[in-house]
């Protein structure tokens, strides 16, 4: 148990440095909060009000894209095999990545909350629903990352999946 916690903490630190070093990941993680922040402060009336569409995109699209990119990048570089051969178990790897990505996603949700995008919902209920959405989206991202051959193909695989998730309620 103690060894697992140590491995998970090491995975969190590794992923934190990888994410902070990769500007593309940071842009993807904060694109929707920043766009909503810009719209709010620019005073664009057409988009003012409820930011639920931005919150939805942040809760579904971002975790899928980020997790799939992380897994595909580590497969491509050979880091994934090295981690597995060094004794990192699958659940330690998954939890380590999910925790650090969840922290960044929650920070994005704080930006949404402070700018008023979530003003029409109960805060506790919104947090629970977003956490569930984050976890489910990250699991889908893990599957896409494992299926994808490399980091470039992640977008081609994740886009149809994301569109199906978004348009499923309409059908």
Positions of the model-derived regions?
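Alpha-helical transmembrane segments and their short interhelical loops
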Residues: 90, 98-155, 169
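Residue-level signature of the cytosolic catalytic core of signaling kinases
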Residues: 1-4, 47, 60, 119-120
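Hydrophobic alpha-helical transmembrane segments of multi-pass membrane transport proteins
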Residues: 48-112
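Short amphipathic alpha-helical coupling elements at transmembrane boundaries
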Residues: 10-18, 81-85, 149
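Aromatic- and glycine-rich beta-strand/loop motifs that create alpha-glucan
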Residues: 1-29
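Hydrophobic alpha-helical transmembrane segments of multi-pass membrane transport/permease proteins
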Residues: 18-66, 102, 106-107, 157-169
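Alpha-helical transmembrane segments of integral membrane proteins
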Residues: 9, 24-28, 48-56, 92, ...
């Amino acid at each position: 148990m103690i060894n697992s916690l140590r491995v998970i903490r090491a995975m969190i630190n590794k992923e934190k440095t990888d994410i902070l070093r990769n500007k593309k990941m940071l842009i993807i993680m904060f694109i929707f909060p920043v766009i909503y922040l810009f719209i709010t402060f620019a005073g664009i009336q057409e988009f003012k009000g409820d930011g639920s569409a931005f919150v939805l995109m942040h809760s579904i699209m971002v975790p899928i894209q980020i997790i799939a990119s992380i897994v595909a990048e580590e497969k491509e570089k050979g880091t994934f095999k090295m981690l597995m051969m060094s004794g990192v178990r699958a659940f330690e790897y998954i939890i380590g990545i999910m925790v650090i990505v969840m922290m960044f996603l929650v920070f994005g949700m704080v930006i949404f909350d402070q700018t008023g995008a979530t003003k029409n919902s109960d805060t506790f209920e919104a947090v629970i629903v977003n956490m569930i959405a984050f976890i489910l989206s990250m699991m889908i991202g893990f599957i896409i990352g494992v299926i994808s051959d490399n980091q470039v193909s992640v977008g081609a695989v994740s886009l149809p999946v994301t569109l199906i998730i978004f348009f499923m309620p309409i059908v």
